[in-house]
Amino acid sequence: MSESEAKSRSATPPSKAKQATPTTTAAANGEKKLTNKELKELKKQEKAAKRAAMKQANGISIEQQQQQAQMKKEKKQLQREQQQKREQKQKNANKKKQNERNVKKSTLFGHLETTEERRATILALTSAVSSPKTSRITAAGLMVPVVASALSGSNVLTASSLMPVGPNASSTVSASAPASTTTTLPASSAALSAGTSSASTNTPTAIQQEIASSNASDVAKTLASISLEAGEFNVIPGISSVIPTVLEQSFDNSSLISSVKELLLNKDLIHPSILLLTSHLAHYKIVGSIPRCIAMLEVFQIVIKDYQTPKGTTLSRNLTSYLSHQIDLLKKARPLSVTMGNAIRWLKQEISLIDPSTPDKAAKKDLCEKIGQFAKEKIELADQLIIDNASTQIEESTTIVTYGSSKVLTELLLHNAISLKKNIKVIVVDSRPLFEGRKMAETLRNAGVNVMYALITSLDTIFNMDVDYVFLGAHSILSNGFLYSRAGTAMLAMSAKRRNIPVLVCCESLKFSQRVQLDSVTFNELADPNDLVNIDYENPVERRGNKGALLNQFIKERKFEKKKLAMENKPKGNKIGGKKGSEGESKDASNEEDSNSKNILDGWQELPSLNIVNILYDLTPPEYIKKVITEFGALPPSSVPVILREYKGSA
């Protein structure tokens, strides 16, 4: 033991001495300890010296080594410059390509949503809703297979694609449906819809048998067990893209894409009547602030009647969020009018006041009755009071100028001409592109009223006549007294003010807004710019209302393919000179005919320096307005805040 201890003791001091030698020597010599960076640089120099020595041993002189190093350095610099040029060129090409494929927007109204964007959103959503498919978000967009979305244990179950097969197909399953769905699901199943039966041959036999022998809830669990991200996703045929890359490339607004995907993820909560109303609003089948509000309230009554409260929640808490999904879709048809916004706020307030202990059936019935009462009080009775108040301003043999079409103005003029037997003359001023005044002029003419119809371009001639009053409708009246109405109203009111013709505005208090606006740029609505372009579409698919980003892209690609195919099939040359000459003459004649028939604004989307803006509304300053006639009486525009306080208190 003593020998081993002695050996160990004798062995340890040398190692310690070796470890302490550098520091002690460095301290003795007064040198600093090298840092890691300096050590790495020293090792690098040692390696370089070794390589130089090896090259020199192989017969390469130091001068040659320096020349090789310089050449290598110059080569790297050249490669770096070429790489930068390629990156800059690619960046410019991508920027140019992005500008070409982006939806054209005016720099002044670039913050507003365009009609193309709204229609593309509706197209994407209706494609997803009308097809019985489940969705998932991929790099190419939101992909939907043929089989319905079914998540095990989820409250979202869309089984519209489960086609009934077999003798037990008539039975239905109500337990598997969520509480929020109003449709009954077929109990027996069937794996795929009839429209994709040809694609179902690729499905493995085991999965077909499993789906065919299961009910709807079992199909849901089976589909939930399939990993949509894995390769097994191929067992479900009929993949189609709802938001393809074309749509994403058309929009440079990321928030728009996210809102579209949000709508698609909640597509199972959209009521069919909301889809129908959205289509009517987007295609301008329902025009006007009050008609749009009445249509929305009627549809909300249907939605509330069909609504079923999910388990574990109450109607007063869940119905508000359920209606929010419907409202999000309505906003994509057209921006909500002020009357629609005020009605929605009132409805949500009424829902929040429902007692949670009230049965759902009684609460829904009471809510639908309140909606009907609200429409009657705030719209029908308000219009009747406005007609009574405004009739006192109209005397015998009065000439009245109106602009566009207004529900309350039409009823006012009919009441004075028919009920009160007043001999009045009405001049209906109209403008492109909606020509709303035509409907009003036709209604008055059919009732026997003396009507003159004119466009807004002849305004100077109209006011040179003996005009007594200018009656205007309103989309909204802001809290600072400005009138927010259809484009052209401000010009009409200003021209009347210059000629000392009183301007009277008939407006329900439901149209009053607490928003303050000084120009029509900050907040407005953009309509389709093609409505301002006088294009006679030969193809009915290209008419307004059927246009969309996806459809336009498809038509453009088809035209390009046809043109390319025609160029490929075109003969290389002509053997007969006379034939060539006759073809040249016919070609010149056709080109001349096309140039004569072509509109100057055709293909304006391809011109980068041209933007066509079709705004729907403008602002009329309060100094141009003499009175605002409401159900509370005739008031100056400065009294709008008082009415807002009264309306808010009564609501």
Swiss-Prot record:
It comes from the Eukaryota. Component of the translation initiation factor 2B (eIF2B) complex which is a heterodecamer of two sets of five different subunits: alpha, beta, gamma, delta and epsilon. Subunits alpha, beta and delta comprise a regulatory subcomplex and subunits epsilon and gamma comprise a catalytic subcomplex. Within the complex, the hexameric regulatory complex resides at the center, with the two heterodimeric catalytic subcomplexes bound on opposite sides. This is Translation initiation factor eIF2B subunit delta. GO terms for biological process: cytoplasmic translational initiation; regulation of translational initiation. Coiled coil: none annotated. It is found in: Cytoplasm, Cytosol. InterPro entries: IF-2B-related (IPR000649), IF_2B-like_C (IPR042529), NagB/RpiA_transferase-like (IPR037171). Residues 11-28 have a biased composition (Low complexity). Residues 30-49, 76-90, 580-590 have a biased composition (Basic and acidic residues). Pfam families: IF-2B. Residues 1-108, 566-600 are annotated as: Disordered. Disulfide bonds: none annotated. It comes from Saccharomyces cerevisiae (strain ATCC 204508 / S288c) (Baker's yeast). Acts as a component of the translation initiation factor 2B (eIF2B) complex, which catalyzes the exchange of GDP for GTP on the eukaryotic initiation factor 2 (eIF2) complex gamma subunit. Its guanine nucleotide exchange factor activity is repressed when bound to eIF2 complex phosphorylated on the alpha subunit, thereby limiting the amount of methionyl-initiator methionine tRNA available to the ribosome and consequently global translation is repressed. The modification N-acetylserine is found at residue 2. Its main location: cytoplasm. The lineage of its organism: Eukaryota, Fungi, Dikarya, Ascomycota, Saccharomycotina. Gene3D superfamilies: Translation initiation factor eif-2b, domain 2 (3.40.50.10470). One of its GO terms (molecular function) is enzyme regulator activity. GO terms for cellular component: cytosol; eukaryotic translation initiation factor 2B complex; guanyl-nucleotide exchange factor complex. Present with 10300 molecules/cell in log phase SD medium. Belongs to the eIF-2B alpha/beta/delta subunits family. The modification Phosphothreonine is found at residue 121. Keywords: Acetylation, Cytoplasm, Initiation factor, Phosphoprotein, Protein biosynthesis, Repressor, Translation regulation.
